[in-house]
């Protein structure tokens, strides 16, 4: 039940990311936003593999742990990118309106990465409980 809830949360926050991009229509998406989107994609792939491997929990213990570690590593990488993105926005963006738009979008992207990381934690707790 907890896994289904967190997966639903991941989908919701990724959907909100797209909605904010469409709603705010920023003049451009910066390099850091693209890097965060790439991390979200990679994190979702790791979650997909981990959820698939939950079906054979006893046989895939090592692979599951590896996926959970990779999800955590991606989240840590995203933290650095997020900090750089926010600093760059305040340093380089001259339009207050664009700054607010990109700050909101970047924060939502970071939330998506954090939800994916939470999914990894739930998967790891299932692994500990049933392995």
What are these language model-derived features?
Residues 1-131:
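Cytosolic, long alpha-helical scaffolding segments
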């Amino acid at each position: 039940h907890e896994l289904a809830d967190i997966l639903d949360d991941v989908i919701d926050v990724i959907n909100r990311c797209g909605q904010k991009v469409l709603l705010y229509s920023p003049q451009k998406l910066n390099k850091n936003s693209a890097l965060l989107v790439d991390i979200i994609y990679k994190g979702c792939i790791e979650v997909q593999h981990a959820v698939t491997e939950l079906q054979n929990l006893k046989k895939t213990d090592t692979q599951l742990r590896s996926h959970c570690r990779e999800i955590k590593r991606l989240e840590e990488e995203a933290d650095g990118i997020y900090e750089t993105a926010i600093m760059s926005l305040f340093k380089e963006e001259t339009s207050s309106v664009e700054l607010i738009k990109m700050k909101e979008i970047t924060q939502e992207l970071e939330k998506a990465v954090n939800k994916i990381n939470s999914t990894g934690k739930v998967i790891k707790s299932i692994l500990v409980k049933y392995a």
